[in-house]
Design a protein with these regions (language model features):
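Oxyanion-binding and handling regions
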Residues: 1-50, 83-103
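Short glycine-rich anion-binding loops that position phosphate/pyrophosphate groups of nucleotides
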Residues: 10, 60-61
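DPxDG-like acidic metal-binding loop motif
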Residues: 54, 58-59, 65-83
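A generic secondary-structure micro-motif detector
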Residues: 28, 63-64
Length: 103
């Protein structure tokens, strides 16, 4: 299962699991709501983090701080789950390696 994270927008956080899109808007900071939101969506789908096979994250354009939050969470999850993390540059529409693939 591929998790796609988009924190580029100022007011909301969007994640997608195999093409199904989930969006949340809140007054909380993205750094405070992203992980609980991912957990909530996985629970609704009766999935766990262990079901993820790859993480893709929007690398821009967008809010610099928001993008940092998304990339940081993606890398932390990828590292802890030993799955690949890839960045998707929405401006160019191409997938690029963010930093590494855990081996």
């Amino acid at each position: 299962m591929i998790l796609y994270i988009d924190t580029s927008q100022r007011e909301d956080v969007t994640i997608s699991l195999d093409g199904q899109v989930f969006k949340t808007a809140s007054k909380k900071e993205k750094s405070q709501r992203l992980l609980p939101f991912i957990d909530e969506v996985l629970r609704k789908k009766k999935l766990s983090l262990k079901d993820l096979t790859e993480i893709k994250v929007n690398t821009g354009p967008g809010s610099f701080t928001g993008l940092k939050v998304g990339v940081s969470v993606a890398q932390a999850l990828g590292w802890s789950l030993n799955i690949p993390v890839n960045g998707k540059d929405m401006k160019k529409g191409e997938v690029i390696d963010i930093k590494y693939k855990i081996e």
